């Protein structure tokens, strides 16, 4: 999904022998840039940093913006060994990039990227995470299994998905993927947008995606109790955080309602859209980002 302009640049960093690419766009006015919170985007499954940039143009005009390519995606390494695909390993890479960014970034993470962000939070703990970052926006992110039965079901789903990735051509898998109920609302998007999303998905490596599912799928998450305790701790520290879900995304809008009722984190339901709010409602998404940014 090549939408980079003349202000876009890429760079790389290494963690435990794995090379990660990231993209960044600088605000035109350096003085204003220093006054505004930078934003760090963490993409979802079968995406890359570029997948953020067709949306929410207002963010890119007002702030320095960074986007990481997670392992096995985009321009980052595609290791043979499974270890780098684990949530802790990807969380460590995210923390390494956070250290490279001037200023404390607002971390905006979608779906699988949210699992990575939560892993980073749990790795260093809420106190340290709050010192390293200025805020957290989680978009359509699972919070981990509540029970062993839920974990067992996730293990089966993820194993089935990894098997499908290995046994079918990628284009056939992506046809299956984009027809899941989770993405039904995206069928209302313009044909050009849907074609770009599909091309972005097809640019991936099937084996790398299978390893991501096996090593960083829902079944690999810490428990719901552990992740929500960390989020609640952030809130008690006055740390700005937001959970965002689409109204048409039955699973994650229900989760958002639960998080709100339990007083774990501030939530927002985007009307008339599904799982990918930043793609389907970029103006709403941009407003949410600015609402979490501290300055």
Regions found by a protein language model. Give the residues of each.
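Conserved HGGG/HGGXW glycine-rich cap/lid loop of the alpha/beta-hydrolase fold
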Residues: 16-78
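The conserved beta1-alpha1 loop
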Residues: 42-44, 110, 245
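Conserved acidic catalytic loop of the alpha/beta-hydrolase fold
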Residues: 88-105
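Gly/Ala-rich beta-loop-alpha elbow adjacent to hydrolase catalytic centers
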Residues: 109-113, 117
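Catalytic histidine-centered segment of alpha/beta-hydrolase-like enzymes
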Residues: 273-286
């Amino acid at each position: 999904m090549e939408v980079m302009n003349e202000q876009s640049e890429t760079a790389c960093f290494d963690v435990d022998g794995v090379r990660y690419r990231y993209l960044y766009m600088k605000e035109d006015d350096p003085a204003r840039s220093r006054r505004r919170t930078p934003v760090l985007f963490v993409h979802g499954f079968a995406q890359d940093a570029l997948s953020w940039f067709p949306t929410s143009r207002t963010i890119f005009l007002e702030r320095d913006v960074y986007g990481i390519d997670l392992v096995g995606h985009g321009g980052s390494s595609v290791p043979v060994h499974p270890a780098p695909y684990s949530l802790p390993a990807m969380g460590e890479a995210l923390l390494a990039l956070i250290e490279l960014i001037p200023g404390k970034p607002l971390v905006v993470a979608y779906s699988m990227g949210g699992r990575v962000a939560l892993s980073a939070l749990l790795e260093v703990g809420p106190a340290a995470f709050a010192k390293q970052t200025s805020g957290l926006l989680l978009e359509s992110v699972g919070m981990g299994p509540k029970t062993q039965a839920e974990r067992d079901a996730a293990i089966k789903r993820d194993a089935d998905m990894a098997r499908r990735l290995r046994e079918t051509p990628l284009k056939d898998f992506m046809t299956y993927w984009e027809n899941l109920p989770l993405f039904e609302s995206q069928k209302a998007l313009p044909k050009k947008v849907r074609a770009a999303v599909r091309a972005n998905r097809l640019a991936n490596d099937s084996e790398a995606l299978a390893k991501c599912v096996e090593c960083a799928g829902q079944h690999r998450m810490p428990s719901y109790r552990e992740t929500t305790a960390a989020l609640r701790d952030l809130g008690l520290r006055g740390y700005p955080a937001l959970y965002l879900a689409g109204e048409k995304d039955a699973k994650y809008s229900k989760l958002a309602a639960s998080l709100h009722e339990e007083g774990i984190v501030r939530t927002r339901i985007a009307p008339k859209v599904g799982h990918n709010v930043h793609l389907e409602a970029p103006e709403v998404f941009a407003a949410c980002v600015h609402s979490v940014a501290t300055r």
